[in-house]
């Protein structure tokens, strides 16, 4: 029976500082490291054997993946990295303190950007965009698909084809798959898996650094889900 494990990265240093992060490539905080280590120990205690891992190109997700596999004695497992699992791109908000953003744009507007399904924040300015376009992580990426800002809906549009083409194929082969990613890229997957409404998915909370297990039928219908 296929098993899917979703894990949101542990707390990042920008999470701890209340900054919009998005595609900014920041490290885990000490708390985030400990969350990931604890989760890896839980995987080991439950005897969960992972066959393949999918993660993003961002350090906080990659390091979370490392701790999960290291603590469960599974560092040999293949890891596939893709930009399609990156966090939602927060555009011009990236790097801003959330309280400062509320003062600048108004609390209602910031709430709409954060918690609506199909409204994206302001785009990056040209200098910010160039810094991402020139990042080696994205040198293979067609500039025409490189986001300047994303809503949750936009994030889903890039995540679900990757699910259909790559991740789901491993599950259909009966594999146990770990997806170590971000709050919004995982929300996109959960919306698709559970057919969650546009209104409900924006308020869906996913614990940081905690494995969420999906037991699936052979045709990938959800039987059960639970946190370790």
UniProtKB/Swiss-Prot annotation:
Disulfide pairings: none
Top-rank lineage group of the source organism: Bacteria
Residues the record marks as site: Transition state stabilizer: 182
InterPro entries assigned to the protein according to its UniProt record, in alphabetical order: His_Pase_superF_clade-1, His_PPase_superfam, PG/BPGM_mutase_AS, Phosphogly_mut1
Pathway assignment: Carbohydrate degradation; glycolysis; pyruvate from D-glyceraldehyde 3-phosphate: step 3/5
Annotated substrate binding sites: 8-15, 21-22, 60, 87-90, 98, 114-115, 183-184
Pfam families for this protein: His_Phos_1 (PF00300)
Described purpose of this protein according to its UniProt entry: Catalyzes the interconversion of 2-phosphoglycerate and 3-phosphoglycerate.
Protein name: 2,3-bisphosphoglycerate-dependent phosphoglycerate mutase
Organism: Staphylococcus saprophyticus subsp. saprophyticus (strain ATCC 15305 / DSM 20229 / NCIMB 8711 / NCTC 7292 / S-41)
EC id: 5.4.2.11
């Amino acid at each position: 029976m296929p098993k899917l494990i979703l894990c949101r990265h542990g707390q990042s240093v920008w999470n701890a500082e209340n900054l919009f992060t998005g595609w900014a490539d920041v490290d885990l905080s000490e708390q985030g490291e400990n969350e990931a280590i604890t989760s890896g120990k839980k995987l080991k205690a439950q005897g969960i054997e992972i066959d393949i891992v999918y993660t993003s190109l961002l350090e906080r997700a990659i390091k979370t993946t490392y701790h999960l596999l290291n603590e469960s004695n599974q560092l040999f497992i293949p890891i596939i990295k893709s930009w399609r699992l990156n966090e939602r791109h927060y555009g011009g908000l990236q790097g801003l303190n959330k309280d400062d953003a509320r003062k600048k744009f108004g609390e209602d507007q910031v709430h709409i950007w954060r918690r609506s399904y199909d409204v994206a924040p302001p785009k990056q300015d040209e200098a910010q965009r160039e810094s991402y376009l020139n990042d080696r992580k994205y040198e293979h990426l067609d500039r025409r698909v490189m986001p300047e800002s994303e809503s949750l809906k936009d994030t889903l549009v890039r995540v679900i084809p990757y699910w259909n083409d790559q991740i789901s194929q491993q599950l259909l082969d009966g594999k146990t798959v770990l997806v170590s990613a971000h709050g919004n890229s995982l929300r996109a997957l959960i919306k698709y898996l559970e057919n969650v409404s546009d209104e409900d998915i924006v308020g869906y909370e996913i614990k940081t650094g905690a494995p969420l297990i999906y037991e699936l039928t052979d045709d990938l219908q959800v039987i059960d889900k639970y946190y370790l």
